[in-house]
Amino acid sequence: MPIKDYYQILGVSKDATAEEIKKAYRRLAKEYHPDISADENASEKFKEINEAYHILSDEERRKEYDRILKSGDEKSYRDFMEYIQDFLESIWQGMRRSPKPKKGGDVRLKLELTLEEAAFGCEKDIEYERWIDCPTCEGKGYVGKMEKVTCHACEGTGRRVSGIFSFPRPCSVCKGRGFIIKNQCPACSGRGRVAMHSLLRVNVPPGTDEGDVLKVPGKGHTGERGGEAGDLYLRVSLKPHPIFKKVGKDLYMEAFISFPLAVLGGTTKIKTLEGSYQEVFLQPGTECGSTKRLQGLGYPIAGGRGDLIITFRIEVPKNVNSNIRALIEKLAKELGEEGIEYQSGVITKILSLLKL
């Protein structure tokens, strides 16, 4: 590897002071900055100028380089360059004439659904904030023809020296461009993007479950410099249901039946998740707390549907008139209950037997 003459690249003598080296670097970096210079080889020259300054601006690196330059030892020079390669790689980044397009950021939101909406699918309107290209300047950051002035922070070099190693980094003021746009767009303050309140209708597929993430491509933040937009991610959260409790793909519910139906048996109608009614036959002597499983009426999940498990509760009348009281007293006698003279106590006991 031939030894480069970094003093010659910067146009300074080998005994130049640190201030002279810095001054030469700023002048050349400004002249050959890829965003300013019309020279077709500006990027390579700018890269070489930064490499030279990186080595000569540090006292220890300059001392080692001077030793190698004096001896002409190309092997030592190659080892020296490999040693500082990590530093140089960070300099080469971002020195292209046209920065790469940058994909927009993703937007992540919580989507609350009822059990019915998630089970059978629906359409939901989503409101959220996202960054889009400024409609005033069409994402350029300026209106009309660009008017630019030299960045005062880096003096047009696009780089600023910072850190204990005097390492040149992209200027944070001008973002490494070496200039500042004078006629910035007033609508976006030169950013080229503005926040917009968006309204989007999304399709929720049937069988959506708690924790599922729905992806809407291209509905995140708009990209920069022509980059593609980010995506919108919606994490599903199921609202508590007043009737059904979901456990996996099964649904659980409680159904209240009358005392005569529990004793005599018969059919009752159960409202399903769809909103339709399903007839259920009860055997005579159905006890409070007994369950019945209806296959295929649970929650729809990919590959099948769960079951509906019903727990029956016996509904006890709260307002007992004289006719009902007489019937219960007669029932108590038939069942062999003692202490009929304590009518209130017996009635209370019978009613308590019907409860949980």
Curated annotation (Swiss-Prot):
One of its GO terms (cellular component) is cytoplasm. InterPro entries: DnaJ (IPR012724), DnaJ_C (IPR002939), DnaJ_domain (IPR001623), HSP40/DnaJ_pept-bd (IPR008971), HSP_DnaJ_Cys-rich_dom (IPR001305), HSP_DnaJ_Cys-rich_dom_sf (IPR036410), J_dom_sf (IPR036869). Binds 2 Zn(2+) ions per monomer. One of its GO terms (molecular function) is zinc ion binding. The keyword Cell membrane does not apply. Residues 5-69 form the J domain. GO terms for biological process: chaperone cofactor-dependent protein refolding; DNA replication; protein refolding; response to heat. Its cofactor is Zn(2+). Keywords: Chaperone, Cytoplasm, DNA replication, Metal-binding, Repeat, Stress response, Zinc, Zinc-finger. The J domain is necessary and sufficient to stimulate DnaK ATPase activity. Zinc center 1 plays an important role in the autonomous, DnaK-independent chaperone activity of DnaJ. Zinc center 2 is essential for interaction with DnaK and for DnaJ activity. Belongs to the DnaJ family. Homodimer. Participates actively in the response to hyperosmotic and heat shock by preventing the aggregation of stress-denatured proteins and by disaggregating proteins, also in an autonomous, DnaK-independent fashion. Unfolded proteins bind initially to DnaJ; upon interaction with the DnaJ-bound protein, DnaK hydrolyzes its bound ATP, resulting in the formation of a stable complex. GrpE releases ADP from DnaK; ATP binding to DnaK triggers the release of the substrate protein, thus completing the reaction cycle. This is Chaperone protein DnaJ. It comes from Hydrogenobacter thermophilus (strain DSM 6534 / IAM 12695 / TK-6).
